[in-house]
Amino acid sequence: MKRTTLFAIFLPLLAVCTGVFLTSAEDPHQKFKGDDAAMMRWLMGELCTEEGVYFTGSGNCVNCHAPDPDGEALVDENGHTVSPVVDWQATMMANSARDPFWKAKVAHEGLVNPEHRESIENVCTACHAPQGFHEAHLTGTAGPNGYTMADLADDALGLDGVGCAACHTIDDINLAGRSNGDLPINPENVAWGGFENPWDGLMSGQTGFIPVYGEHMRNSEVCASCH
């Protein structure tokens, strides 16, 4: 009797486990579909949708650059996502302005050098919160000692980290000779990209930024000012 009961419990469990194994074996990289629509909604809800004069939050880019729930776009021939939003969200770039280790280091520097605290914060936020930093300086809203951690705490664009617009608005002006986050930000809402002849209709209407091919976006000099 006991053996029969155990068999009755074990058999369905074996079937479930086998089904899961076979499903995984058949398609270890499931396409984005079904429940992943919820993931897309989460991405759209969590990312910054703030709009500034020179920058726009990554949440305004997600409509076109997030995973396709039907698995038809932004996946390769094997169903792997090639969504820049998914790749970016897991990086230090996306979390640069919220990284607790960085915030602790900045706080420590301020404690050691209290007379220079705000100036130090201004230097650090140039690379860790470039959208907030440059938006404040370019619009003249930065304080006398620059863009501080207090400014960052209430700034959605700054907390978006090294967001989409932070890199895609960098003009090709002496990039290899720059340092300390001295980024030449385009003043005309141009979004430089690595693909030639982009269609600008949807993107300019959705975000206000015009996609333009920029050869420099394929070169490491774009990263040089901070790295």
Regions inferred by a protein language model and the residue ranges of each:
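Sequence context of c-type cytochrome heme-c attachment sites
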Residues: 23-160, 169-218, 225
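Positively charged n-region of N-terminal signal peptides that target proteins for export
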Residues: 1-5
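Bacterial N-terminal signal peptides
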Residues: 9-19
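Structural signature of FAD isoalloxazine-binding scaffolds in flavoprotein oxidoreductases
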Residues: 163
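Ca2+-coordinating acidic residues in Ca2+-binding motifs
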Residues: 166
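Intrinsic low-complexity, intrinsically disordered segments enriched in polar/basic residues
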Residues: 6-9, 93
